[in-house]
């Protein structure tokens, strides 16, 4: 019985985030293919949010009695953090320098233990802090490019990406702290439903209406949205049910590694090849991959 319990815990804390990371890599490939149809990221994000809302509804089967109305502000705050983080991240990636924004977004991993401490959830073991810092540096190395941008765009990217990373980190921490009060099953679908309603703020950013999306673009767009939804279910369920948000985020950070591997292996066939892989970039990304695996090993074996 103890062995079964340990296997379930390992699956929840490590397996689900790893599955989410791999699913994210698949969605990244389809996102690149979708971008080829000229669909801006705001419409893509709205579609992904709607599909994610649907994917979270089966959690109602695990729900018990709903809490008092006085607690319904909690999923609203978490939903707001999700949408704010999404807007800031997409703004940084679309309007700023990707070579700056992508590595800075990796700071989410180290923001998580900081917010846990600030919100009174207690201090994490030293090994977890070291793993979070190592994974953060690894993500930055994995996102290395030789691109150079102007100073103004660099500062803009730095501020928006860091703010987006902080919002998503606080989102994860609040899911862990507040979902137990709701019996977990109810909190997740309510929160995602609220975030989808809040996603209507994206409408002003649409360059064209949703109905103008080409019919031939829907297979890749719907596939990307489905994978995004499934990876969200996996990582959020891990945080909500097993309450190891710092560990889950370190494992989930491998999504960048799987994305790079997927682009390298399959990008040519899906029209999503990476032209930035110079010898210097390859060396730094390899170092990042090794550091990331070392950070995960620290969590598992120490």
Model-based region annotation:
Residues 85-127, 144:
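Membrane-interface helix-loop-helix junctions at boundaries between adjacent transmembrane segments
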Residues 1-42, 150-186, 193, 221-241, ...:
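Glycine-/small-residue-enriched transmembrane alpha-helix faces in small-molecule transporters
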Residues 12-20, 47, 54-88, 105, ...:
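Loop-to-transmembrane-helix transition segments
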Residues 19-84, 134-137, 187-209, 254-267, ...:
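Transmembrane alpha-helices of multi-pass small-molecule transport proteins
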Residues 30-33, 37, 91, 95, ...:
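Membrane-interface helix caps of multi-pass small-molecule transporters
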Residues 37-43, 88-104, 180-187, 234-256:
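Structural motif at transmembrane-helix junctions in multi-pass transporters
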Residues 2-7, 52-70, 114, 118, ...:
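Membrane-interface helix-cap regions at the ends of transmembrane helices
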Residues 51, 56, 107, 113-117, ...:
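Hydrophobic transmembrane alpha-helices of multi-pass small-molecule transport proteins
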